[in-house]
Amino acid sequence: MIDVNNFEYMKIGLASPNKIRSWSRGEVKKPETINYRTLKPEKDGLFCERIFGPQKDWECHCGKYKRVRYKGVVCDRCGVEVTRAKVRRERMGHIELAAPVSHIWYFKGIPSRMGLVLDMSPRSLEEVIYFASYVVTDPGDTPLEKKQLLSEKEFRAYLDKYGRSFTAQMGAEAIRKLLMDIDLDKEVDGLKEELQTAQGQRRTRAIKRLEVLEAFRNSGNEPSWMILDVLPVIPPELRPMVQLDGGRFATSDLNDLYRRVINRNNRLKRLLDLGAPSIIVQNEKRMLQEAVDALIDNGRRGRPVTGPGNRPLKSLSHMLKGKQGRFRQNLLGKRVDYSGRSVIVVGPNLKMYQCGLPKEMALELFKPFVMKELVSKGLAHNIKSAKRKVERVQPEVWDVLEEVIKEHPVLLNRAPTLHRLGIQAFEPTLVEGRAIKLHPLVCTAYNADFDGDQMAVHVPLSAEAQAEARILMLAAQNILNPKDGKPVVTPSQDMVLGNYYLTMEREGAKGEGSVFKDTNEALIAYQNGYVHLHTRIAIPVASLGKTTFKEEQNSQLLLTTVGKLIFNEILPESFPYVNEPTAHNLEVETPSKYMVPTSTNVKELFQERDVVAPFKKGFLGNIIAEVFKKFKITETSKMLDRMKDLGFKYSTKAGITVGVADIVVLPEKKEILAEAEKKVDRVLKQFRRGLITEEERYDRVISIWSEAKDVIQDKLMGSLDKRNPIFMMSDSGARGNASNFTQLAGMRGLMANPSGRIIELPIKSSFREGLTVLEYFISTHGARKGLADTALKTADSGYLTRRLVDVAQDVIVREDDCGTDRGLEVEAIKEGNEIIEGLYDRLVGRVAFKTVRHPETGEPIVKKNELIHEDLAKQIVEAGVEQVTIRSVFTCDTRHGVCKKCYGRNLATGSDVEVGEAVGIIAAQSIGEPGTQLTMRTFHTGGVAGDDITQGLPRIQELFEARNPKGQAVITEIEGEVTNINEADKREITVKGEMETKTYSIPYGARIKVELGEQVVPGQSLTEGSIDPKELLKVQGMTGVQEYLLREVQKVYRMQGVEIGDKHVEVMVRQMLRKIRVIDAGDTEVLPGSLIEIQHFNDENKKVLLSGKRPATGRPVLLGITKASLETDSFLSAASFQETTRVLTDAAIKGKRDELVGLKENVIIGKLVPAGTGMNRYRNLDIVSDYDQQAVGTEEAVMEEAVTTE
């Protein structure tokens, strides 16, 4: 018996007529489905029990044999085998066609495969197949040519002239005769010779034909199998017919399509038996051909066959295609048992690794576990009574549930799952009510809020799944964001506000200058109202018990506030006492300016000193990162919980609210606006006199009003009290920003109209004063545009993520070191003088390719093949090194993936990347997830003008799809000097090199970037604009393009304030550049003009070079991500992505084998993915839990029991 779940590869091919007959259990001869009175299947019909198996388990059609004991008996009365009814899902039938028909995929696809094999145009093929023309299949000794088309008239004429000495036929049988006559070897050799000389169109055609013919020759498929003699009929359960509750029947469209085929086939048989006139037979054959076409791919040719209500019927092809097709709906996305969903609410008292699960939900999810436990505790006699107990919710069930649920993690998922942090594991705690409780700190990762979001719960069942959930997916383990390695669980909103309020200082607060003997005394004083949280006090350094103070400091006093004492209690003991929001305080020590001798008059000292700033959101993030660096994950998650509790507690105690009185009115606003009005009038006067153009007038008016708004904003922020609640909220980073405040208290400013052009009439009112009707109307433009954009672009971003995942899903860390001899030189990415991504960011977590030495002393800072961590990167930058060569994904030589050294550190864990990590998918998610932010930026400003960017998502798509960019720059192909810039009539630039001089014409309206006499290098842009990466590939080769794409993608994201690790972009760009176009095949096996993997190309060349023959030549190609996904070696992965029919047609002709190396293919066939714990090296590990795994089987056990007892 073969193991269904264990196979090495999957192969697809054309089926020969005999193969189809061998699959079949019998011929379907009648179009009938079921008998309308008995509702039993008709004999020899589409649902026949004799062909497809019994409808009820262990029961034949006529009822002579019932029960299991007759298993395997074939009934002598009705001929039905007694077996399980589920064989109706797997047994096939067939229809013997009275005339051959062509398979529409091979005849109609682009390019037409049949046409390429026969070297005929699709038009003439269509004429022959659909009985419009005759084709000469054997010219005999007449002057006619083989494959020549003849109309009815010509055929009659030649028949009269030559008699029967030639044969011409029509329909699919003629094509089959031609296909059978083809000698593949002869054709292939002829084409190879033709390729030596052919040029242009002929060459392209020859290459295409050669590809198809080689495919047939190598795969063992016969070209004549593209014509069908026998039609397979799929099992009836896959095209079911069900009775609705009105006595009517609903049936799958396929049954209608099969019925049409059978009807026409039977009619054709009858006509042939009767010896009907040829014109009638031809018409019937054409109708049969059309019926089979509709069955295989309805709507591909001509008008689709429609059902009731003019709805096109879904054919076999449609069953596979698109989001609702077999691939994406059922193979890649399955619904799972043991899952539930509910609304989420905040659970502020949960620990980092916990979630609250509603009791009734938990009971249903853990039902089998509870049942097993009830039996093993002796609370129920057997599984059946246990089930009854659970269903009646008897009180003892809850205690058992509490026990079962301990130590059993569940997965929580929020849609849309944009990155891997969208599913995390938690330990459930039972809660009353019907809402899931979620820890407030994981909201950022899920992008969740509590305005009605819902989340799904899944239960990992097996011991292995539980272990993986606990070790890899527990929320407390996922503190860092995989896209940039920064903490993702930073406190937000209330928590930030509470900690901000707690660490504020205030001059002259109650009890300023008090000195306490230790923290406890200070807290007692605070609780009794002698001092305030913001009071500046002093405390002996020694009483804090911190290990980070120096010896001599222990005898001094520390100047701090009561709030900061409380705040520091949550930090680990060996962490510096945090007294000011600076990096020095975090990383090194508490600054010594806060230490004073015990004899100091503290009160007087405080009067001279300035107030220290409180801790804002960013600084809290830095604290978390620093704690993580020093103490690793467990301590960090504990500290996060303490920080959360502190934040909630003190934001509550602070009682910070927002009232209308908190929005201050700016007295100078009237004057500022009047001044701006005057300026605008002046500009208008100049315009009326014709001194300036309409454009200039518009631009000046816009800039006058923007300036006015900025002045108001600056004055507002200056006049604000530091204790104003709204100011505190925006300053701490909890909510809001300066622009929001200006709109509340100052003026709303300029707005854009729906087309994005700024309306020159500003909104002078603020929300505090209220808008006039016209102003209100103008602001609705921007707000509405924001909402529409968001809705549209979210879909765009999701689709981008899908394409990225698809192109990189098989990139996995495969080995420790690939031993490459190339590295990548990196330096800071700059745009003009502005640094977009510094060298430090580009080095952290990468491996040095060669030793990095100090430029002055020559001392080695980093050795070859050593990982560069934060401190080393800092040293390199401080030493003044500007360029470092690192190991990069670009230069990695590993097959189907990357190696550990070239990838470097795993950003999500902060340690070395493991073999088996699916870095391709992580990269795709890291680039795709911020894609939604790139677009949603317009949404939050309520459409205030000036925030709209042309960059963003469209630019990212342009780069990854390798499209010709808008506003393309002209680049130079040679190195040399700019000798001529002609801007007047011809608009051209001349570059003179050592060997040649080139002149480039400049498109109208392009701004020139170079100056006369400037030295330029190949690939440098001569005009402003984006470079076309395909052009760059020709000029600079692979390295140039890789660096360009990396730089440009980083630019777009960094401009939006999104940080993404370089390595993610590198993984993507590498996938776009892994193919090579063969120019000349040399003596290798590869086909000229074909696209093949670079590594495969190199292998073939090595083979021929070793035997002293001529190698192939090729040039690298840059493919967009969509194209690259479709060009993958795995047909399963490509077919489930896009263009399903084309991919499958192609794969079938080539007889492709899918080796199942990527993740997607394995998900489709239901195997473990070959990444992480699913890799072969881990496959044979057994995880045994003390809690045995019988529980899941109990549901089935109940069912079995129920069946036997009936």
From Swiss-Prot:
Looking up InterPro entries in the UniProt record yields:
DNA-dir_RpoC_beta_prime, DNA-dir_RpoC_beta_prime_bact, RNA_pol_asu, RNA_pol_N, RNA_pol_Rpb1_1, RNA_pol_Rpb1_3, RNA_pol_Rpb1_3_sf, RNA_pol_Rpb1_4
Q: Which GO terms describe its biological process?
A: DNA-templated transcription
Reactions it catalyzes: RNA(n) + a ribonucleoside 5'-triphosphate = RNA(n+1) + diphosphate
Cofactors required: Mg(2+); Zn(2+)
User: GO: which molecular function terms?
Assistant: DNA binding; DNA-directed RNA polymerase activity; magnesium ion binding; zinc ion binding
Q: Which Gene3D superfamilies match?
A: 1.10.132.30, 1.10.150.390, 1.10.1790.20, 1.10.40.90, 2.40.40.20, 2.40.50.100, RNA polymerase II, clamp domain, RNA polymerase Rpb1, domain 3
Indicate yes or no for the key word Amino-acid biosynthesis.
no
Q: What class of enzyme is it?
A: transferase
According to its UniProt record, which protein family does this protein belong to? Belongs to the RNA polymerase beta' chain family.
Q: How does it assemble?
A: The RNAP catalytic core consists of 2 alpha, 1 beta, 1 beta' and 1 omega subunit. When a sigma factor is associated with the core the holoenzyme is formed, which can initiate transcription.
Please report the name of this protein according to its UniProt entry.
DNA-directed RNA polymerase subunit beta'
> Can you name the source organism?
Halalkalibacterium halodurans (strain ATCC BAA-125 / DSM 18197 / FERM 7344 / JCM 9153 / C-125) (Bacillus halodurans)
